[in-house]
Each structure stands twice: as C-alpha cells, then as structure tokens.
Amino acid sequence: MRLPIFLDTDPGIDDAVAIAAAIFTPELDLQLMTTVAGNVSVEKTTRNALQLLHFWNVDIPLAQGAAVPLVRAPRDAASVHGESGMAGYDFVEHNRQPLGIPAFLAIRDALMRAPEPVTLVAIGPLTNIALLLSQCPECKPYIRRLVIMGGSAGRGNCTPNAEFNIAADPEAAACVFRSGIEIVMCGLDVTNQAILTPDYLATLPELNRTGKMLHALFSHYRSGSMQSGLRMHDLCAIAWLVRPELFTLKPCFVAVETQGEFTSGTTVVDIDGCLGKPANVQVALDLNVKGFQQWVAEVLALVP
C-alpha cells in the first residue's frame, strides 16, 4: 500500500530532485504540495513548483504558503540556488495556478478529509507547519508523523551552528519541535553525506528527459560542484520514508535556540541526555551512503 504524504517545499534545486522522488517513487502517494519562502521568495518557490508539475504533466494540488517568517525578517539562499531558485533550465510557459487558500489551511482541509493519518514532509523552513499546528491544533491526531530536512546535531551551513531551514524561521521550528507530534529530523549530519558522485552526475543527460533537466540545474547548484559531487539535502527526507534502513536514528530531546547572538537557529540536540528531558525527535545521525546513491539511481531511472 502506498504511503500518503503531503510535501511542504521551497524549490530550490535540490528540492526538484526530492519532488521528483516524491511523485514517482512507487511506494509514495503525493497528495498535496505546499510552498514556503526559503531558498527564494514564496512567489518564486510557487512558480518553480508549478513549473515542475507542468514539466512532468502531473496534477497534484498546490497551495502557496507563508511569504515571511513568523516574527523576523526573511532570508534566502539565492547564492546557492540562483536568483530564480532553479537557475540553469528554461521551463516552458504554462497557465497553472495555486489553490486559492493559504498553505496551512490547505493542509488542514486535506488532513481532515483523509481516511487515515497522513505523513507530512517539510524540506524548507517550517513556517507553514507552525501555522498549521498553532492555528489548527485539532489537526494533530490526523498527522501520522512529520519528516523534515533541517537542523543538525553539530555544525551549521549558514552560521557556524545553524542549518538554513531552521535558521530561516527559528520561532516556527521551535513551535513545531514543542508540538508533541512525532518528528523525524534528517539534518546536516546525514545530508552532508548524501553526495551524488561526479561519475553518476555525468550520466544524467543520457538517462531521460528529467536527467537532462536536473543536469542543467545542477550546473548552477552551489552545494558542491559537478567535479567534486553534489549534496542532495532535501532528498534525504524522501529517502527515509522508503528506505529507513539506510539511516541511523536516535531518539533525542531537541530544542531550537531563538535568542542567541551567535547561535540563533541552532537545533540543540541532547544526544547524551544531559538535560534529562524526554526525547521529542528521532534524529538521523548517520547514512549508508552507497545504499543511498543506489536508491537515487533507481528512482531517477523511473522518472520520465
């Protein structure tokens, strides 16, 4: 039986690979997509998501979400993904439009209609998820779990300690981590290992139409290089859904620092139980890299 999922995303070049996997992995049933400001503005992430849906000719409802963090000024990662968020490929024009309601309400409505609890997957800042949990707490029983790409048990990637998706809206992340829902965190501890090799990247143009598109995007992606390998951060959240045995997880208490002058956005992961608080997150700490790479190759071979 396919696993029903909703995907909250901020495309983003590596988001494009994660979206492809979410759509075409046979074990998954992607029923709703929502966008959030993150890698670039929400107008651009929405445009990029709609372009991808049109590229693959799939009809999945998509709702535009939060344009700004809960309480602070927005930040982006255009230096990594390009000003458009998906620089490097010329998508054809289309007339697709997002749903006419905010993302968190679209998630609420879809959860309440679903015949069984749904897995939420968030691969951008957690603003939409925080709005859902704070404004619609009645939805919690309908959430099977939340799988996120974000955070770190060690170093960061946009500050010395903070990972971008959490640092972009620390207050939202803190709200989500305090919510009591089941959370799986695929942070930099595993995503920095999730590298596609130069040899594999070189095969993409001959793989299929999607391979050509991704190869063009990857040539503009700044999370590594085509010569040294590229990190597939967001794809780890999708991989865990279908190949959890590739990941080493540990239940930990995790809090989000929202006040520190140098540490704002840090996920404080109590690996050794020093704080004596009950675990609230399953934290991914290690990855079977070869198994991950093999899975990616299998999935992308299925994509048209």
From Swiss-Prot:
Enzyme Commission number(s): 3.2.-.-
UniProt entry tagged with the keyword Hydrolase: yes
Gene Ontology BP term (one): purine nucleobase metabolic process
Keyword Hydrolase: yes
Annotated signal sequence range: none
Entry GO MF terms: purine nucleosidase activity; uridine nucleosidase activity
Enzyme class: hydrolase
Single GO cellular component term: cytosol
Location of the active site: 233
A Pfam family reported for this protein in Swiss-Prot or TrEMBL: IU_nuc_hydro
UniProtKB keywords: Glycosidase, Hydrolase
Domain of life: Bacteria
Entry function: Hydrolyzes both purine and pyrimidine ribonucleosides with a broad-substrate specificity.
PANTHER family linked to this entry: INOSINE-URIDINE PREFERRING NUCLEOSIDE HYDROLASE, NON-SPECIFIC RIBONUCLEOSIDE HYDROLASE RIHC
Homology family: Belongs to the IUNH family. RihC subfamily.
Protein name (database record): Non-specific ribonucleoside hydrolase RihC
Organism of this sequence: Escherichia coli O6:K15:H31 (strain 536 / UPEC)
